[in-house]
Swiss-Prot record:
One of its GO terms (biological process) is defense response. Tuber. Residues 1-23 form the signal peptide. PROSITE patterns: PNPLA. Glycans are attached at residue 115. The active site is at 77 (nucleophile), 215 (proton acceptor). Its EC number is 3.1.1.-. This is Patatin-2-Kuras 3. Probable lipolytic acyl hydrolase (LAH), an activity which is thought to be involved in the response of tubers to pathogens.
Length: 386
């Protein structure tokens, strides 16, 4: 929780100098953030498939990809996996996975990743298949090769510090130019579920640099939206592409934050009487659930408040299902029946209103975002041609 607070303080310190000068659409910094949640990544994957389809329709281009429209794509845990899939280049320097390929990936590999390969004295899953499939899909690609700026979090249990993998930090910290498959496994290595991940890179002097990493949710508590915005803010200050942005304000931000769902109000909640009888192990399991839920709500609360205060509420969209029940609440239930339910959750979510105070549905809001993203991309391209 202290790490989340530090990121929040850093973010608001950077933005404290923002001007009120309204920028043109072409100068917007566009950010996509994807939560962690294991197999529940199927929910944001379903949303991304819809959004990419809308971008293809708006631009009349079946080859349009999300990485073409977002300046920063950030994720933690399963969100980090999605980030890598849509930003890692293939042999043609295009994203190796379209958004429509992500859900089939979960269906094909989820049951093997979340199998019963662990032991009673260790993590529930040994992670061997997971790492193998990541190596096969992502190859030797490193951070610097990502097709847009990325922000993938993990936590080093040896240094007791968060590790943020971004392209913009490589000049200062070349040891962060790790292989994408190492990063993806690390950000998803949730304690008790998968073993921590050890790998080595090299510093600018050629010295070995060791990583001992676990799930990025330990660093960002599941929702990387603040982290992604902090990276975007820093990027806008150093990237020549954003030279015309003198001082970033909220009218120059477009943030899409995708959740993996939270439990319904009375599902998996507890009373003080129940909790009074718990031992340490029971508390560990409950605290993880409570912390993730609290972080998701509070991060959205912070961002909604700030964007609204700056009269830029239409520039921020949080897509989240808050009424998961039954098996859909589990991050490791990769049965075909449950994965089908998660797809349905994502599809039904598109038809729901963004808030109780707004008649706009998530589907309508995403169509609006697709138009904004398309317009911004075209304006920036036109500006570059002069």
């Amino acid at each position: 929780m202290a790490t989340t607070k530090s990121v929040l303080v850093l973010f608001f310190m950077i933005l404290a100098t923002t001007s009120s000068t309204c920028a043109t659409l072409g100068e917007m910094v566009t950010v996509l953030s994807i939560d962690g949640g294991g197999i529940k990544g199927i929910i944001p994957a379903t949303i991304l498939e819809f959004l990419e389809g809308q971008l293809q329709e708006v631009d009349n281009n079946k080859d349009a990809r999300l990485a073409d429209y977002f300046d920063v794509i950030g994720g933690t845990s399963t969100g980090g996996l999605l980030t890598a899939m849509i930003t890692t280049p293939n042999e043609n320097n295009r994203p190796f996975a379209a958004a429509k390929d992500i859900v089939p990936f979960y269906f094909e590999h989820g049951p093997h990743i979340f199998n019963s390969s662990g032991s009673i004295f260790g993590p529930m899953y040994d992670g061997k298949y997971f790492l193998q499939v990541l190596q096969e899909k992502l190859g030797e690609t490193r951070v610097h090769q990502a097709l847009t700026e990325v922000a993938i979090s993990s936590f080093d249990i040896k240094t007791n510090k968060p590790v943020i993998f971004t392209k913009s930090n490589l000049a200062k910290s070349p040891e962060l130019d790790a292989k994408m498959y190492d990063i993806c496994y690390s950000t998803a290595a949730a304690p008790t579920y998968f073993p921590p991940h050890y790998f080595v890179t090299h510093t600018s002097n050629g010295d070995k640099y060791e990583f001992n990493l676990v799930d990025g949710a330990v660093a960002t508590v599941g929702d990387p939206a603040l982290l992604s915005l902090s990276v975007a803010t820093k990027l806008a200050q150093v990237d020549p592409k954003f030279a015309s942005i003198k001082s970033l304000n909220y009218k120059q931000m477009l943030l899409l934050s995708l959740g993996t769902g939270t439990n319904s109000e009375f599902d998996k909640t507890y009373t003080a009487e129940e909790a009074a009888k718990w031992g340490p192990l029971r508390w560990i399991l409950a605290i993880q659930q409570m912390t993730n839920a609290a972080s998701s709500y509070m991060t959205d609360y912070y961002l909604s408040t700030v964007f609204q205060a700056r009269h830029s509420q239409n520039n921020y969209l949080r897509v989240q299902e808050n009424a998961l029940t039954g098996t859909t609440t589990e991050m490791d239930d990769a049965s075909e029946a449950n994965m089908e339910l998660l797809v349905q959750v994502g599809e039904k979510l598109l038809k729901k209103p963004v808030s109780k105070d707004s008649p706009e549905t998530y589907e309508e809001a995403l169509k609006r975002f697709a138009k904004l993203l398309s317009d911004r991309k075209k304006l920036r391209a036109n500006k570059a041609s002069y």
